[in-house]
Amino acid sequence: MVRVRLAPSPTGTLHIGTARTAVFNWLYAKSQNGDFLLRIEDTDKERSKPEFTQNILEGLQWLGIDWAEDPVIQSERVAQHRDAIRALLEKGLAYRCYANESELATMRDAQKASNQPPRYDNRHRNLTKEQETAYQAEGRDAVIRFRIDDDADIHWNDLVRGTMRWRGGDLGGDMVVARRAPADQIGDPLYNLVVVVDDAAMEITHVIRGEDHIANTAKQLLLYEALGLPSPTFAHAPLILNADGKKLSKRDGVTSINEFRSMGYTAEAIANYMTLLGWSVPEGMEERFTLREAADQFSFDRVNKAGARFDWDKLNWLNAQVLHSWSSAQLLDVLRPLWLKNGWTIPNDNGWALELCELLGPSLTLLNDGLDQAAPFFECPDLEDDGLKQLQSEGAKAAISHLIDALQAERWMGTDFDQAQTLLGDAAKAAGVKKGVMMKSLRAALLGRLQGPDLLTTWSLLAKNSDDLPRLQRCLS
């Protein structure tokens, strides 16, 4: 059975890159009737926080991503990681390196001066017992390094990139697998080692991650072999790029799923767009889909090698498509909490709020638009420049005045639209203006501007709460 995993580090909130990796893993697992698993890589003791773990889990659930088993907590497996390092030491495949930071800095400076790439020169690979004893007598601690032969031939068939081949000499020298500690101890195990041990223990069959991990894959394959563990199949998805074609980073602004949510993007649109960041839909498939629909079509032969540029216009279009497909009841379920949080009073009868959602729905791109566009229905808006100009135009005040007189004589309750048309026509005629002037002036009086949703429905909603007449009267004061 296919078993894939997402292995986020809880050192921050759920990042868009992690979310895209989660989506690809989940899609592949579902396409193969396999399992999607979670591992929380919390071994960075200083930066890992429980609230970030909670944020990641909640963010994945919001996107519609579920997992088959309880998350594995990496920090609870340190004993197994040290056992693996101990096994490497016993086999002679790892050793203690006593080089201190000053010596390593001098080594790197010399390499830089001679235009050589930075790498550890394996200087302590073959220390004698006497040399080790001498370093220990100096009180030096040691890291533990894994031997990487320069002539090692590392290759694998990547599901996205085809045959990949690396030389051991390109991996920067013998790799540190445990942090510095006294010579009789094993320090904190490091990323490449713990990932191999944990993936094997979780019986992961496929590792799907970003292309920035390709060099790590070469190192990890050597560790799988050294530890006698079966290696998984690898797939390296393209990076997410900004508009300039560079890797998307915090400097580009919004990168956290939290931020996308607060801006008013829906989970369905974000999950949809994450799928399109690097995956091409098959012929005949629409670009708007659910994760479940995408899983039925997902395969790595449609995952691109080139980086995927983040396109705000495409995301906005997808989000609008999602919102426009919702019923008024669905929209109200999401907008009601936003309206209440804003301090607005919603009538107990859902009918009025549902009518408002039906009116606003077709014009929404983001959920937050449902705040901006709903505001004039809950509180009297200020007059904007175009609205003020309209109300100061010839005949506008007379038209509003005649409409007020008509409403005071025959109150419109917001239900009979034929009555509304008659009231507007009569007021325009009495003021000696065209009906278009009457309509523009009414919109300016009610909304404070000349742009907005259907005018009669707008008037109807305000009339049902008796908010129309005070706004009309304001225009004459």
UniProtKB/Swiss-Prot annotation:
InterPro entries: aa-tRNA-synth_I_cd-bd, aa-tRNA-synth_I_codon-bd_sub2, aa-tRNA-synth_I_CS, aa_tRNA-synth_I_cd-bd_sf, Glu-tRNA-ligase_bac/mito, Glu-tRNA-synth_I_codon-bd_sub1, Glu/Gln-tRNA-synth, Glu/Gln-tRNA-synth_Ib_cat-dom. ATP binds at K250. PROSITE patterns: AA_TRNA_LIGASE_I. It comes from the Bacteria. Pfam families: Anticodon_2, tRNA-synt_1c. A motif ('HIGH' region) lies at residues 8-18. A motif ('KMSKS' region) lies at residues 247-251. It is found in: Cytoplasm. Transmembrane segments: none annotated. Its EC number is 6.1.1.17. Keywords: Aminoacyl-tRNA synthetase, ATP-binding, Cytoplasm, Ligase, Nucleotide-binding, Protein biosynthesis. Coiled coil: none annotated. Gene3D superfamilies: 1.10.10.350, Glutamate-tRNA synthetase, class I, anticodon-binding domain 1, Glutamyl-trna Synthetase, Domain 2, Glutamyl-tRNA Synthetase, Domain 3, HUPs. Belongs to the class-I aminoacyl-tRNA synthetase family. Glutamate--tRNA ligase type 1 subfamily. Catalyzes the attachment of glutamate to tRNA(Glu) in a two-step reaction: glutamate is first activated by ATP to form Glu-AMP and then transferred to the acceptor end of tRNA(Glu). NCBIfam families: gltX_bact, PRK05710.1-4. Monomer. This is Glutamate--tRNA ligase. It comes from Synechococcus sp. (strain CC9902). The lineage of its organism: Bacteria, Bacillati, Cyanobacteriota, Cyanophyceae, Synechococcales.
